[in-house]
Swiss-Prot record:
Gene: queF
Major subcellular site: cytoplasm
Protein name: NADPH-dependent 7-cyano-7-deazaguanine reductase
Binding site for substrate: 88-90, 228-229
Organism: Yersinia enterocolitica serotype O:8 / biotype 1B (strain NCTC 13174 / 8081)
GO molecular function, one term: preQ1 synthase activity
EC nos: 1.7.1.13
Keywords, alphabetical: Cytoplasm, NADP, Oxidoreductase, Queuosine biosynthesis
Subunit structure, as described in the record: Homodimer.
Length: 281
């Protein structure tokens, strides 16, 4: 269980509570969660963050009415800077997007501008937004994380409780530059404990990380309760602490829920994330 499970910032969230669905625009549905809530226990503060990055959201259920009342549909891609004060709680984001359904917007740019203004204000940070017509996405291939997959190791696993100590002594003597991938990342929502399924890519330069230890560490998230963004920052922080690579990038892409997927990345180098959806997305 996360040490901040009962943090006061979580008390007013609609997440985990019965909720009425509104189909007319209502910005008050958006709810923020302070990033400091999980960062401070890790010793991370705005003036000493060891990474930069973003939370990339894909919006699959976005619709509104044009000026003639004709429904419009789009796929949205949103990138929220990791140095924003808050992350955006996903259920509230879903409810907020639902409020567009019977709302008239004069054009697509009005929708994009509204999203940008509202999300920036909620997160207190920089947000970039792209809206795609469906025919722009039709030929987008299923992407795949580049790197060597950890998942075929023949391991006996008997513990699924989070334990960063799996990384103790995991840094070897040889120095390498490599990318490692696992599709076995599974954690649980901090509030509802619903499962969150993801794939993670870890790219680094430095002492070679023991692959068995790294996979055991990632599997130990299986009963861990934390938001997607927080899990990625925890992985980054633990690898830096135990393995001390010179460069590190951690990028996770999670399966969608409620028409949204969340894909956080954190890096201390010039990492550029792919944005194509993976097989399970």
């Amino acid at each position: 269980m996360s040490s901040y499970q009962d943090h006061k910032a979580l008390a007013e969230l609609t997440l985990g509570k019965p909720t009425a669905y509104c189909d007319h625009y209502d910005v008050t549905l958006l709810q923020a969660v302070p990033r400091s809530m999980n960062r401070e226990p890790l010793g991370l503060y705005p003036d000493n963050l060891p990474f930069h990055g973003a939370d990339i959201w894909t919006l699959y259920e976005l619709s509104w009415l044009n000026s003639k009342g004709l429904p419009q549909v789009a796929i949205g891609e949103i990138s929220l800077n990791a140095d924003s004060v808050n992350l955006i709680e996903s259920k509230s984001f879903k409810l907020y997007l639902n409020s567009f359904n019977q709302t008239v917007f004069t054009d697509w740019e009005s929708v994009r501008t509204t999203l940008q203004q509202d999300l920036s204000a909620c997160a207190q940070g920089e947000v970039s937004i792209t809206l795609y017509r469906l025919d722009e996405m039709t030929h987008q291939p299923i992407a795949n994380f580049s790197g060597e997959c950890l998942d075929e190791q023949d391991l006996y696993i008997d513990s699924y409780e989070f334990n960063a100590d799996y990384l103790q002594g995991a840094a070897g003597k040889n120095r390498v530059t490599e990318s490692l991938v696992s599709h076995l990342l599974k954690s649980n929502c901090l509030i509802t404990h619903q499962p969150d399924w993801g794939s993670v890519q870890i790219s680094y330069s430095g002492p070679q990380i023991n692959r068995e230890a790294l996979l055991r560490y990632l599997i130990s998230f299986r009963h861990h309760n934390e938001f997607h963004e927080q899990c990625v920052e925890r992985i980054f922080n633990d690898i830096m602490r135990f393995c001390q690579p010179e460069t590190l990038s951690v990028y996770a892409r999670y399966t969608r829920r409620g028409g949204l997927d969340i894909n956080p990345w954190r890096s201390n180098t010039d990492f550029v994330p792919l944005t194509g959806r993976l097989a399970r997305q």
